[in-house]
Amino acid sequence: MKVMGSLKSAKSRDRDCKIVRRKGRIYVINKKKPRFKARQGY
């Protein structure tokens, strides 16, 4: 999982990427290609 400052580029890497919010953090998840997972962290 990548930790990124902005998830805009992470969301556009694949069309199946979705943004979800869990426990106050923002994640990009992708069920078909899990290597595209990312989390926003400052």
Curated annotation (Swiss-Prot):
It comes from Anaplasma marginale (strain St. Maries). One of its GO terms (cellular component) is ribonucleoprotein complex. GO terms for molecular function: structural constituent of ribosome. One of its GO terms (biological process) is translation. Pfam families: Ribosomal_L36. The gene is rpmJ. Keywords: Ribonucleoprotein, Ribosomal protein. SUPFAM superfamilies: Ribosomal protein L36. This is Large ribosomal subunit protein bL36.
